[in-house]
């Protein structure tokens, strides 16, 4: 199954600030696999909130939701040290989007 990836400005800001080029490349490779339906290691945190788990880069995490069965919306990212705050932020973004359809400013990304 092929997914269309979209990202929020919060996610883009975080991802663009990753300093380690190897971590960024591995992250991009993982997102390319997600786009092709291979999510790898992930955890469902709530009915519509998921966490991609990485075992490099300080325990990198990407929080996402799936819309319409075909669109993966990348909400925020972080690592183990910011996990609690990142989950709260992702939940807030989802709540806002649920109350006001189309409120999430996002852009389509492809690999």
Predicted features along the sequence, with ranges:
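A short, surface-exposed loop/turn module that caps and links secondary-structure elements
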Residues: 29-56, 104-111
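A short, compositionally biased N-terminal segment around positions ~18-40 that is enriched
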Residues: 19-33
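Enriched for short, Lys/Arg-rich terminal
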Residues: 1-5, 13, 21-24, 39, ...
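PIN/NYN-family metal-dependent endoribonuclease catalytic core
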Residues: 8
């Amino acid at each position: 199954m092929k997914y269309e990836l979209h990202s929020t400005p919060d996610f883009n800001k975080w991802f663009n600030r990753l300093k380690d080029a190897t971590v960024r490349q591995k992250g991009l490779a993982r997102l390319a696999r997600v786009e092709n339906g291979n999510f790898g290691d992930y955890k469902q945190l709530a009915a519509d909130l998921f966490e991609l788990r990485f075992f490099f880069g300080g325990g990198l995490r990407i929080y996402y939701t799936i819309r319409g069965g075909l669109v993966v919306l990348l909400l925020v990212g972080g690592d183990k040290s910011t996990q609690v705050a990142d989950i709260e932020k992702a939940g807030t973004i989802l709540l806002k989007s649920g109350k006001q359809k189309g409120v999430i400013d996002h852009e389509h990304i492809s690999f």
